């Protein structure tokens, strides 16, 4: 079996390590506990969180015990890492609600019922929330020199623009997390994004000062980049969320299927559990026959199934095929709802007579009745994927998909959705 560190190295998943030889020796001798933290800054995790989540999963598959730490306390403070300005503070009730949602999402990726190495879910509010300010300053704060903290990138990058004491103290709170998990869960490794290096090394320093003969390690993963220079995980519609109510499985699938040839092999290494041989085979196919997009198809399948399940993946493929071929009628009402999310729509009475010309004008697909008639005559108008060329056409019950939707298209890309009361 490939050593976990060798597998991570092949995948390009190690940005920095505090002590590579020491960590390798530890992993050779014993199964360890490790953690990564997730602050509830929204009501869902997004694909930027996938790498650390999958890192925990990789270690669990290798026999180690992952700890997913939800930042119920640190989420109330705000991490300055990578931020140019102060975060807006959220209230306790919202953070508690978001923490629960994130817990539920994490349970889809980690096995909390495993016999030998079940994952652990922790919330740092359980220890930070109970600590009074005197204990915090005497027992924890005294271990941190101001010059040491000012030298950290997360702080130094904000000195000119300004940083509050609240965010300045975030590093200490995260360090306290590592110390608490080290003491109570024998956690010896923290994993985080490359922007967390300063916070991780601060935690190691606190452990070293607080515990005799301490052995603890830190490892960061790279920032995910795109070859075209745009930000990974963002589209015109915003962030790609792991919650299907915020980003549908179809939208999620489309994000991955549209991966640039220059990025696809890297993402296969980062986001899938395919073997080295399978990835190298897909890399060769991308090189020799890029038009077939086999690597993109496999990437989209692996990640969509991982996040949303096999059924949602198959639905996403079905929607994609229907939209590509124009065969809208073969979609179910649920698939239409998912596939045309965000498309302009109009709700009408089922009993209404709906002349196609009037619908084109009401929907603003055509600017006038005259233009609408011209569009129909020229064969530019489609109802559920079927071309309509009769200007006297009236939409009937037969044009409703499961009685709920009619999809109107003008030209190649202008869609409109009719829904029925």
UniProtKB/Swiss-Prot annotation:
Chain span(s) of sequence motif 'HIGH' region: 40-49
Chief place of localization: cytoplasm
Taxonomic classification: Bacteria, Bacillati, Bacillota, Bacilli, Bacillales
Pfam families for the chain: SYY_C-terminal (PF22421), tRNA-synt_1b (PF00579)
Gene3D superfamilies assigned to the protein according to its UniProt record, in alphabetical order: HUPs (3.40.50.620), RNA-binding S4 domain (3.10.290.10), Tyrosyl-Transfer RNA Synthetase (1.10.240.10)
Protein name as it appears in the record: Tyrosine--tRNA ligase 1
Binding site for L-tyrosine: 35, 170, 174
InterPro entries for this protein: aa-tRNA-synth_I_CS, aa-tRNA-synth_Ic, Rossmann-like_a/b/a_fold, S4_RNA-bd, S4_RNA-bd_sf, SYY-like_C, Tyr-tRNA-ligase, Tyr-tRNA-ligase_bac-type
The keyword Iron appears for this protein: no
Binding site for ATP: 234
Signal sequence residues: none
Function per UniProt: Catalyzes the attachment of tyrosine to tRNA(Tyr) in a two-step reaction: tyrosine is first activated by ATP to form Tyr-AMP and then transferred to the acceptor end of tRNA(Tyr).
SMART domains reported in the protein's UniProt record: S4
Subcellular compartments: Cytoplasm
SUPFAM superfamilies cross-referenced by the UniProt entry: Alpha-L RNA-binding motif (SSF55174), Nucleotidylyl transferase (SSF52374)
Swiss-Prot/TrEMBL keywords: Aminoacyl-tRNA synthetase, ATP-binding, Cytoplasm, Ligase, Nucleotide-binding, Protein biosynthesis, RNA-binding
UniProt cross-references to CDD domains, sorted A to Z: S4, Tyr_Trp_RS_core
S4 RNA-binding domain location: 354-420
Family: Belongs to the class-I aminoacyl-tRNA synthetase family. TyrS type 1 subfamily.
Reactions accelerated catalytically: tRNA(Tyr) + L-tyrosine + ATP = L-tyrosyl-tRNA(Tyr) + AMP + diphosphate + H(+)
EC numbers, comma separated: 6.1.1.1
